[in-house]
Amino acid sequence: MAKKAKSKNTVSSRAKVLQTEQDSAGKSKEEKLEEEKNPTDNKKDDTLTIKEETMENNNSKTKAPAAPESNANKSAESVITRKTKETSITLGLRLNGAGNYDVNTGVGFFDHMLEGFAKHGNFDLKIICKGDLNVDCHHTVEDVGIVLGQAIKNAVGNKEGMNRYATFIQPMDDALVLVSVDLCNRTYLNFDYDFKVERVGYFETETVKEFFRAVADEAGMNIHIKVLDGTNTHHIIEATFKAFANALAIAVSDSGRVGVLSTKGAL
């Protein structure tokens, strides 16, 4: 009896195989191609699920949802051109740069200060300036401050994800200078130091204040400068530019937060 049952099952299996082959053979080439192009609905759903899971796994190596990305420094660069009867300036600034610089204002000491600003802030900076140096360096220094402030404002954008605030104390031999900044979209300069000499080379020391006032006004930022110590004017001015560079670099860097650092929701 067992042998007969086995034989019956074998015959039944062979019959199914033959029926399948016959069904397949009875289909036209067009029908077979159509089946290959349009698999069953269940197969489609499985494929979509796999693709979605693969994309999710590529974006996040863990199962936890990925945190929203900060926007800090995603487009942190700007190029400004400004021409007046007193100066002609083209300035390029990249805040998330590498400390590269190419500066030519026609005022050697001022170039030196701006190069230090770029290097210590790790900014890329290019300035081509032609000013009325036959008068003095006042217009050149102030107007470069105006254009630099405009470039900073453009480069920081909506300030999402940025630290916004920073304070840096810069030593340089006898000089010690504190600079605090706030990228708040409000202009304010606090710089109450009076230099003991009128010039360093061709550079007029009183223009330091005019430069930072222009930057603050055009960038929409608070700048506080405190000369804590120092006797050498060159060192004091250089420490001021470097302190400003370091403070600004911290203020524009990524805080890890989402959005702007303000209860108002915008700056």
Report each predicted region and the residues it spans.
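Polybasic, lysine-enriched low-complexity intrinsically disordered terminal tails
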Residues: 1-65
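N-terminal intrinsically disordered, cationic/polar leader segments
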Residues: 3, 56, 71-267
